[in-house]
Amino acid sequence: MKILLANKFYYRRGGDCIYMLNLEKLLKAHGHEVAVFAMDYPENLDTPWKKYFPKNMSKLMAFTRPFGSHEVKSTFKKLLDDFKPDVMHLNNVHTQLSPVMAELAHQRGIKVVWTLHDYKLLCPRYDCLKNGNTICETCFNGDKKACLDNKCMKGSKLASFIGYKEAVVWNRERLEVC
């Protein structure tokens, strides 16, 4: 089976990265053909798939990435054209890569599996903590506006606005069809 793994980082940075690297190794050991898609970072492990990795972005361009930037879409489509996966496995893809990959794969009839390593689909801040220390479930009802009121993202109105917009764009209803 041809399996495409996606994660924003392709090096041992955190639990999601270690999980994906171990999964890649395990899938290959069981005879699957595996491709990877990640952001282009100097710390990345070497891979023949790095030519498809979107380049790191300026702070100005960072505003477009959560919504599926042109570069992410074009490099990802090229990888889909060249590799032709049977299944795509998303991991930690929010912000830098974005869930747009699930839509693009689904449009081509590619099955999509997504391992959620955090609470991003429930909470724009990822961790369900108000100000980093109080458990918060305010956004669970689907209304993410509390993110703006509480400046949940880095204590910043601007970062919280981007987090809010990302949560509104990539809502459950939009993603569950993938």
Task: Give the label of every model feature segment.
Residues 1-42, 81-83, 107-111:
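N-terminal subdomain of nucleotide-sugar transferases
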Residues 77-97, 110-115:
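Short N-terminal targeting/anchoring amphipathic segment
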Residues 20, 96-99:
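Short, well-ordered alpha-helical microsegments
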